[in-house]
Amino acid sequence: MRVNITLACTECKQRNYNTSKNKKSNPDRMELKKYCKFCKTHTAHRETK
């Protein structure tokens, strides 16, 4: 079952990306390194509620 999630920057807390994940294979919170246009650098983005 795929669910839609939002990824937020860990530096500035801006919600920059929307994506989906498979809850069965990834039950814990997802963290990806993505570009933040507010910080103007690549930072870790963590799944939010």
From Swiss-Prot:
Keyword flag Magnesium: no
GO process terms (BP): translation
Name of the protein in question: Large ribosomal subunit protein bL33
Gene name as annotated: rpmG
GO molecular function annotations of the record: structural constituent of ribosome
InterPro entries assigned to the protein according to its UniProt record, in alphabetical order: Ribosomal_bL33 (IPR001705), Ribosomal_bL33_CS (IPR018264), Ribosomal_bL33_sf (IPR038584), Ribosomal_zn-bd (IPR011332)
Organism: Alkaliphilus oremlandii (strain OhILAs)
Gene3D superfamilies: Ribosomal protein L33 (2.20.28.120)
Keywords per UniProt: Ribonucleoprotein, Ribosomal protein
Short name of one Pfam family: Ribosomal_L33
